């Protein structure tokens, strides 16, 4: 396959692959180890996991590219590309879907939607350097471009606009100045401070008093954070859906659909709760409906517009007292005798601003105003409620990131250092520095497109001499790709689509890695083109895992059934088998050499060119398993009948058979050569040339 240069994803995956150190395992699954969970993987599982991660990384990048370009397509074409991506079975097929998208874009089929007219106003008017080249049209553009800027400095008198001149500052000269001291504070200010201290003493508060401005600022910050979180939640749901729709089912991170479903269920539960609250409110609002109708009738008689009045919220004789944020203009709200009075801010309009406490306290100096505002905020318990709300908000966020026992569901620098050592700490610090170095443009690209490109300085930090991920060759290559990197991504996607197959690298052989209680299901990849040496299998069934070129040497099997797992060119050599039946698993070119066995029935599993050599067997019957070119050589057998298993060209050579039977198994060209039969029967099994 062509050398791929996908920026960042390939490099990170390669670095991670290089640093994996798989361990031998005694059991498989999550194990509680102190304050963390440990999942032990053998070498095969580690390689398979890395293969999966790399495939997900490539598919993730391609899904991000598709999400960016697919927005320009009509809805029906979007569905075609998304369905193609969902049906893809591997990275190569996914890349082919992307190539169709890229080709359509190049051919101009992904232009603006039909009948959509885009009008773009230039931000800057560029005029020719030579004044003689100016045309009347150019001058009109220049005049119109500056009109908006000039209008900002106009003061209108009737229908005439006059430019406002900048006011000059008047300089005052004095012979001396008097500095204020604490004794100069007026009585009202002292009273406010005294009242504030009294309230704080009653609440047993000893910490620094929080100014009212800070309390109001915290409230605004909480409100903005709640809005931002709601917006981020919607963006996250949209992004997850796009990534899932544009990623093959094979490579979808299983956590993403779960997260999307969970988010949707939470939203549904919130909506249900709102509807229930609304229903309860409706039950007690029956008398209020008469009031609403009366108000509506009065307004109609007064000649006022009552359009959509029934859909509006009626606020009647319900003044807001000491509000902490300004009243928002809301067209869905009908306000009747419900002003905002004595607000703690000086914003808003009309009565709200005139009656606000900062406005009423303007007769006092700044110290007096702030002192009385501090008292009012403290007496009302605003700071305490803000602190409680912040605590609830913080605990909710922390709860989402921790397990039921309070253990974080993620690696922190502290626990990673404790578990994995200082080397892993240095790796985490590299990514901490990298995260802090992102520019606003990079953050925007990450949010909008799902990927961004590193600067040379960032690449130096990640792959340079001082980094634990030091990779000089990769660094040089990535620096060369800084010119139009998206072109290289497109080039590599096309290379993936044309490749015959996609693999990380040649699979390493599995050596000295026991499999205990480790079911191998759909494990064709790690069992093919791999030597398995000195790796016993115990209680580890192999199911739906065909294997090609996967010899197993010096690796005994104990209670390892082979089910629906054909094997080709995968001999077993010096490999004892105990209670390991072979069921619905044809063996082709699969010799068994020095493979003694006990209780290993072969059922519905044809054998071709799979001789048993020096492999004594006890209670290993062949049932409904025809075989050809499958001699038994120096392989004595006890209690191993052939039942409904025709065979041809399969002589039995120097292989005594005891308690042996051939039942309903015709055979041809399969003579007995120096092989004594003891207590043997042949029933309904004709033979030819044997």
Curated annotation (Swiss-Prot):
Q: Where is the signal peptide?
A: 1-18
- What is the tissue localization of expression for this protein? Expressed in the major body hypodermal syncytium (Hyp7), the dorsal and ventral ridges of the hypodermis, hypodermal cells in the head and tail, and the pharyngeal myoepithelium, but not the lateral seam cells.
Which segments does the entry list as coiled coil? 219-285
Transmembrane region(s): 514-534, 544-564, 579-599, 618-638, 643-663
Positions bearing carbohydrate: 42, 204, 305, 415
**What biological-process GO terms show up in the record?**
cuticle development involved in collagen and cuticulin-based cuticle molting cycle; epidermis development
Localization of this protein:
Membrane; Secreted
Mutation: residue 348 to R; reported impact is: In mg439; defective molting
Report any Pfam family annotated for this entry.
Moulting_cycle
Q: Which UniProt keywords apply?
A: Coiled coil, Developmental protein, Glycoprotein, Membrane, Secreted, Signal, Transmembrane, Transmembrane helix
Disulfide bond as a keyword?
Answer: no
In terms of PANTHER family, this protein maps to: MLT-TEN (MLT-10) RELATED, PTHR21523
User: What does the function comment of this entry state?
Assistant: Required for the efficient removal of larval cuticles during the molting cycle as well as the synthesis of new cuticles.
What family name appears in the similarity comment? Belongs to the mlt-10-like family.
Protein name, entry field: Molting protein mlt-10
- Organism equals Caenorhabditis elegans
Q: In the record, what lineage is assigned to the organism producing the protein? A: Eukaryota, Metazoa, Ecdysozoa, Nematoda, Chromadorea
